[in-house]
């Protein structure tokens, strides 16, 4: 369990091998982390009567990563828990800019 939980039951899924961030985690390990996280989330809903859960992984200090060992947060959520992610969402100025951004990302995706 997280020592400073957002809500009671907030759990961490931590790989045994050291990986500073998500980019160095092998795909099979990352997949297992999310499968385990989802199973824990379902258990939290059943055991502690939550309405939902978030799976959260921060990669890098600017993304909120404090402990430099990759880990996945399983945050149980209630309709009225008062917690809000601090999202700042703004649409792309144009469809062309959105498409250019998507193309640049697609060029760098490595799939084996």
Regions found by a protein language model. Give the residues of each.
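HIT superfamily nucleotide-processing domains
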Residues: 1-112
